[in-house]
C-alpha cells in the first residue's frame, strides 16, 4: 500500500473544501419540522444547524454518562462529522484505488455477508478466524450497528456506515476488548487514523476509569494509540472482505499497526497480584 495520504491530520484537499461549503450551505437552511426537506436516502433525517448542535450536545453528555449507549455514540458521530470531517474521510477513499472500489461496490458487513461459520473454520491466525473468534469472545455481532441517519450527503452516509461496520475489525486485529478501557484505547487510535471528532470526544470517558486503569491507559495504551494512529495506513481503505484468508500478523505489519499491550492479560495479572497481596495480608494478621 502507498504511504498514508495525510501529511497533516487536518490538511484539506480542494474537493474537501468545496464539499465543506456545500455542507455548510445545506446545514444553514432555514427549515423547521413543518417544511423539512425530503430525505436524500432511505432513513435519512435532515437536520438544521440548531438541531444538529442540540443532537451533538445531548448525545455527548448521554454517552459520557453511559458509554454503552451505542445509539448515542452513533448520533454523536454523525452530528459532529459534518460539514467537514466526513468529507475528508470520503476524499481519502477517493484518492486511494481500493477506497474507490469500496465506494463503487458499497459492500455491507453483516453476519450473512461475511458467512461467520465459514470464518470460524479458517486457519488460526487468519484475519477471518481472528475476527470471528473476537466476536464470539466478546459476545457481539456485526448485525448490531445502527444505520446512519443524520449525514446529508448520501455517499458520505455510506462512508460513515462503512467506518461503523469496520469498527469490530479494528478491535479484532488489535485484540482490544469492548470494555471501556479497551474502547478508549481503540478510539484514541481511530481519532488519529480517521480524524472523526466523535472518536476524540469519546476520550472524555477516561474520567470514568478507576485510578489504576487511568494510569495504565496513559502509560501503555495511549502511547500505543498515538504511534500506531499516526503511522498506520488509513483503515477506511481496507477492503476487509478481501483480507479474510490472510495472516493477521502480516496484515498488521502491512498496515503499520503495532500489537498493543494485551489488556485482558494485564488485568488478569493485576487481579492475581491483588489476590496474593490479600492472602499474604490475611496470613500476616493471623500469625
UniProtKB/Swiss-Prot annotation:
It is found in: Mitochondrion inner membrane. InterPro entries: Coq4, Coq4_euk. One of its GO terms (biological process) is ubiquinone biosynthetic process. Its main location: mitochondrion. Its EC number is 4.1.1.130. Component of a multi-subunit COQ enzyme complex, composed of at least coq3, coq4, coq5, coq6, coq7 and coq9. PANTHER family: UBIQUINONE BIOSYNTHESIS PROTEIN, UBIQUINONE BIOSYNTHESIS PROTEIN COQ4 HOMOLOG, MITOCHONDRIAL. This is Ubiquinone biosynthesis protein coq4, mitochondrial. It comes from Talaromyces marneffei (strain ATCC 18224 / CBS 334.59 / QM 7333).
